[in-house]
Design a protein with these regions (language model features):
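Canonical Rossmann dinucleotide-binding motif of NAD(H)/NADP(H)-dependent dehydrogenases/reductases
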Residues: 1-29
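Rossmann-fold scaffold of SDR-type NAD(P)-dependent oxidoreductases
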Residues: 7, 75-83, 130, 173
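Conserved glycine-rich Rossmann-like NAD(P)H-binding loop of the short-chain dehydrogenase/reductase
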Residues: 24-40
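Rossmann-fold cofactor-recognition segment
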Residues: 46-62
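Active-site Tyr-X3-Lys motif and surrounding loop/helix of classical short-chain dehydrogenase/reductase
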Residues: 66, 88-92, 96-103
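Catalytic loop of short-chain dehydrogenase/reductase
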Residues: 84, 91-95, 127-167
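C-terminal helical subdomain
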Residues: 167-170, 174-180, 186-226
Length: 226
C-alpha cells in the first residue's frame, strides 16, 4: 500500500487526487487548514483505501514539522497542491501580495520537500509532484496574473533544483493541470477535476520500472517546455 500526502486536499484538484489514490487502495493524508471541512471531505470520498485528514497550513513551520513527525519515514507520494490565486495586475500589486503568493505557492512546497525528500532518498523511492501552471512557464512568457505567475515560476525553479537532489528511484516533477473547473478556475473552465488530476495520479502511481521521469514539467502525461 502506498502512502500519500496531498496538500489542499479538501477541494478541487486536491480532493480529486485524494479520491483517486484512495480508490487505488492508498493510505492518503488529506492536508487541510480547516480540519472540520477536511474530515467531512475525507469521509465523503474515501474508497478502497483510507483517507486521514491532517491539519496543514503549508505556511506554518509548526504544522509542517508536526506532520513530518506524524507521518514518519514511510511517505511514498507528496503532492504539493495547495495554492492561492491573486488576480491583481502588476501595477496594483504590493510587496505583501507577492510575498503571500510566494509563501503559499513556493515556500510551502519548499518546506515540505525539505522534510520529506531526505526521507525518500534514504528509502530510495518516492514521488514528489508540484502542481504548477502554464502561467509560470517562460515558454508562455509567464502570462496571466503577475503574483500567481511569479510564484508558479518560482515553484518550477524549485522543482528543477529539488530534482537534482533526488536519489535512486525518487522523482521530483511539476504538473500543469490546465484550466480546471474548481473554486479557483471558475465555472467557465473547459476541464473537469478528473482531467486536472489525471497526470498527477499517473506520476504518483507509475511503476518504478517504467523509466525515470525527473525534473520535468508535464501536461496530459507528456513533458512540456518550462
Amino acid at each position: 500500500m502506498r502512502t500519500a500526502l496531498v496538500t489542499g486536499g479538501n477541494r478541487g484538484i486536491g480532493r480529486e487526487v485524494c479520491r483517486a489514490l484512495s480508490a487505488l487502495g492508498d493510505h492518503v493524508y488529506l492536508g487541510s487548514r480547516d480540519v472540520v471541512v477536511g474530515r467531512r471531505v475525507a469521509r465523503a470520498i474515501q474508497s478502497e483505501g483510507d483517507i486521514e485528514c491532517v491539519r496543514l497550513d503549508v505556511t506554518s513551520g509548526e504544522d509542517v514539522s508536526a506532520l513530518s513527525e506524524h507521518v514518519g519515514e514511510n511517505l511514498d507520494v507528496l503532492v504539493n497542491n495547495a495554492g492561492i490565486y491573486n488576480a491583481l495586475p502588476f501595477r496594483r500589486l504590493s510587496v505583501d501580495d507577492v510575498r503571500q503568493s510566494c509563501e503559499t505557492n513556493m515556500l510551502g512546497p519548499f518546506s515540505l520537500i525539505s522534510e520529506f525528500l531526505p526521507k525518500m532518498n534514504r528509502r530510495g523511492q518516492g514521488r514528489i509532484i508540484n502542481v504548477s501552471s502554464g502561467y509560470g512557464t517562460f515558454s508562455d512568457r509567464i502570462s496571466g496574473p503577475a503574483a500567481y505567475g511569479i510564484s508558479k515560476a518560482a515553484l518550477n525553479a524549485l522543482t528543477v533544483v529539488a530534482s537534482q537532489e533526488a536519489e535512486g528511484n525518487v522523482e521530483v516533477n511539476a504538473v500543469c493541470p490546465g484550466w480546471v473547473r474548481t473554486d479557483m478556475g471558475g465555472d467557465g473552465a473547459p476541464r473537469d477535476v478528473s482531467e486536472g488530476a489525471d497526470t498527477i495520479v499517473w506520476l504518483a502511481t507509475r511503476p518504478a520500472d517504467g523509466g525515470r521521469i525527473n525534473g520535468q514539467l508535464l501536461r496530459d502525461r507528456k513533458v512540456v517546455q518550462w
